[in-house]
């Protein structure tokens, strides 16, 4: 019986990995230019990190985490998101005790159980950033602008930035009560999950994907109409800064995000080119998450962007190269007896100088080797022929024109190295 990848997971094959490398290269350049340093946390954490960090009332913790006990009886969870693990690392290593703000980024796989869909996998990849120690609106605006800059560098179009403020512990209780009073008469018609959310955290009802729940919550009180002065001023400043930077956005008073730790600014980026599951990233401020995980009062803000969704959007917008195979610089073809040692030695010399070299391993005819070279899209082929070797020469063919020239065997490595160095310059 053939064993396949687990449901909800996908292999990233050689023809696809080039696209991922493009994303990763863009991420590294972006983060360097914005002053972020990389952090890498374990793929699994103590379950308490997510129960205390993400929130016990969230769908993620209640329905979607991969939980298990190790042989020592410890409760562990495959990470469903990157913020809580980053906060755990911040506290464990006292990164907050140095110069502030602390600006971190990460990429890697996350895990959530759910019904697999085209853009909803059980193992998926995120690019995220976190900023700790800065509470002013300027860092909120920078984080949002940075997310949009990432998409812009990839060439993505037709994206919409949704923006909201969901208040803070000072003003949210009054809003929760107003929302609860609005929903109470309709409670019997809500889905079973939202009936439970009514008392635990009624804001989750606004995030429900059930169509009937969405209909029942139409006309509900909005967070922006219940903000305290501090939150209202903060939100006004964020909008002013985004306007000054030319970052377009749409206000969405139903946007609450799916995690309990958010305060004040919340945002989401959507693409209409990937179907109903249109979110390709989002984030917000979480000024009390560090305390919730046992640390001092350190404000934070960040985002998480789904990379599979980014790639799907790029594909649907025609931004992915159809031929994504790795291009080699040079192919070495062998023709005749006694050519292998020379060809192999030349290949190793060139590789050590940074030239990407492919060669034949299957003892094929010269004609078949040239077809292989064409498939690799190499600009040049070196033919190591039995007759030429007797004369101390090699043949260099330019694939674009078909022109050939002979080069001395003893000077071949230096000549070819200079050829590619000049092309790069």
Curated annotation (Swiss-Prot):
Entry keyword annotation includes Metal-binding: no
Q: Which InterPro entries match?
A: aa-tRNA-synth_II, aa-tRNA-synth_II/BPL/LPL, Anticodon-bd, Anticodon-bd_dom_sf, His-tRNA-ligase, HisRS-like_core, HisRS/HisZ, HisRS_anticodon
EC class (word): ligase
Which Gene3D superfamilies does its entry note?
Anticodon-binding domain (3.40.50.800), Bira Bifunctional Protein, Domain 2 (3.30.930.10)
The protein's location, in the record's own words, is:
Cytoplasm
**GO CC terms:** cytoplasm
Enzyme Commission numbers on file: 6.1.1.21
One GO molecular function term?
Answer: histidine-tRNA ligase activity
Q: Which family does it belong to?
A: Belongs to the class-II aminoacyl-tRNA synthetase family.
What's the protein here called? Histidine--tRNA ligase
Q: Which organism is it from?
A: Heliobacterium modesticaldum (strain ATCC 51547 / Ice1)
